[in-house]
Design a protein with these regions (language model features):
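Mid-domain alpha/beta scaffold segments of enzyme catalytic cores
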Residues: 1-121, 127, 139-140, 144, ...
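Short, acidic/turn-prone active-site loops that include or flank metal/cofactor-
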Residues: 24-27, 179-184, 208-209
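Short, charged, surface-exposed secondary-structure boundary motifs
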Residues: 30-32, 184-191, 212-214
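Short helix-capping segments at alpha-helix termini
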Residues: 53-55, 147-151, 196-198, 227-233
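Short, glycine/acidic-enriched loop or turn micro-motifs at the edges of active sites
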Residues: 100, 131, 210
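Catalytic pocket-lining loop regions of alpha/beta-barrel enzymes
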Residues: 112-196, 201-203
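Short acidic/histidine-rich active-site segments
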Residues: 197-215, 235
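Mid-to-C-terminal alpha-helical segments outside catalytic/metal-binding sites
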Residues: 219-260
Length: 260
């Protein structure tokens, strides 16, 4: 939410959102110094949580070197020398976003190092699947996880589309679906995926970044699912129970399954 205005928090609160998880993100312009990353990590673990709390929203976050910035291998490696300090913050519920952007060897190096750190720290992992060559990037991520003999039930494979959901789901990962006005899923497409694959290990999220994006994508998807006849139990599982179950692996989520 660092790229969004305060009005967005108000709109989210009015729409009934009471908690969110903000993944570590790029800043539009590539960062050039390790200290810029560290200041950003402080921002989303401190100030952003305070900003959300003013609207009654519980703010969690994930910490990681985003794959968009992993190709500056020297800088990314320097950032990783201190990143574990932020893993200990009470609002940090996962390591991420990690993964591939351009699908390079340097990105894989940084991915592997952060996966090792995350599992050592006992934190789950949020994986970014790339905008371009999405299936190739997803398959390479799965290969890395399997090569490292890591438990996929501790990993969220995010930004799935119709192209990737089968391999993500069949390999035992939690499956995120980003509803985004231009480049990712619409509420209708997300609902169609849930209809085909069911609610187990499924989640839906929004994107609140520098381009066209909508912080109300989740309630809009809920509205679409209700119109299409999904039961309240299925909707609740996808947008509430499943995220709580996944992020509770961290031991830091103080929310309960179910809603009134």
């Amino acid at each position: 939410m660092i790229s969004r205005i305060t009005d967005d928090y108000e709109k989210m609160a009015v729409a009934g959102i009471v908690a969110l998880t903000e993944p570590s993100f790029w800043l539009g312009e590539p960062r050039k110094h390790a200290g810029t990353f560290y200041d950003y990590f402080d921002h989303i673990t401190n100030f952003e949580a305070q900003r959300a709390a003013e609207y009654g929203i519980k703010h969690y976050c994930t910490i990681g070197v985003n794959p968009r910035e992993a190709n500056d291998i020297d800088l990314a490696t320097e950032v990783l020398t201190r990143i574990e300090e932020w893993f200990e913050r009470p609002s940090v519920v996962a390591v991420g976003e990690l993964g591939f952007d351009l699908i390079t060897d340097d990105e894989e190096t940084i991915l592997r190092r952060q996966l090792e750190m995350a599992f050592s720290a006992g934190l789950p992992v949020m994986i970014h699947t790339p905008h371009r060559n999405k299936l190739e990037g997803t398959m390479r991520t799965i290969k890395v996880v399997q090569d490292m003999d890591l438990d996929p039930s501790r990993i969220l494979m995010d930004h799935n589309t119709e192209e990737t959901i089968e391999v993500s789901h069949d390999n035992g990962f939690w499956c995120g679906h980003t509803v985004y006005p231009v480049t990712k899923l619409s509420p209708e497409r997300a609902a169609a995926i849930f209809e085909k694959y069911g609610p187990d290990r499924m989640m839906v999220n929004s994107s609140c970044d520098w381009g066209p994006s909508d912080p109300l994508s989740v309630p809009r998807t809920v509205w679409r699912m209700r119109r299409e006849g999904f039961s309240e139990d299925v909707i609740r599982k996808i947008v509430w129970d499943n995220p709580i179950a996944f992020y509770s692996i961290s031991g830091r989520v103080d929310l309960q399954p179910g809603w009134e």
